[in-house]
Amino acid sequence: MKLWSILGNSQRLDGGAMFGNAPRAMWQKWSPPDELNRIELACRALLATPVNGKTVLFEAGIGAFFEPKLRERYGVVEDRHVLLDSLSGAGFSHEDVDVVVLSHLHFDHAGGLLAPWREGAAPQLLFPNATFVVGAEHWERARHP
């Protein structure tokens, strides 16, 4: 089996929320905040193959599905789908993935399942050959919020 750390879209989130009770004077050395106190966070997925003959992706990150105004609001840095670029760099496409495992269905973990935003286009699910795996409680909560 081979494992790849696959880079996805990055996002900027409030540094105080991310570092909890650690003083800003400490964490800003490692992660300088912007004018809104947001720090850049990388989103990474894990690709494993073969796992019982399957290509498995763990997590999908935030992706590039937001329209520009929402992309800015949620601090998504790139306007392209970095996860797809990174899969390609590892020699794979989203069509090659047999199984996608998600820890939960928040948009910053599952947004990468959608194609990049296009003006006037309906959302499009990627990974057409994959079986999606998520815990039953998370699935039911998404179905019945």
Can you describe what each PLM-predicted range is?
Residues 55, 61-145:
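Active-site HxH/HxHxD metal-binding segment of metal-dependent hydrolases
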Residues 2, 8-90:
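Conserved beta-strand hairpin/beta-sheet module of binuclear metal-dependent hydrolase folds
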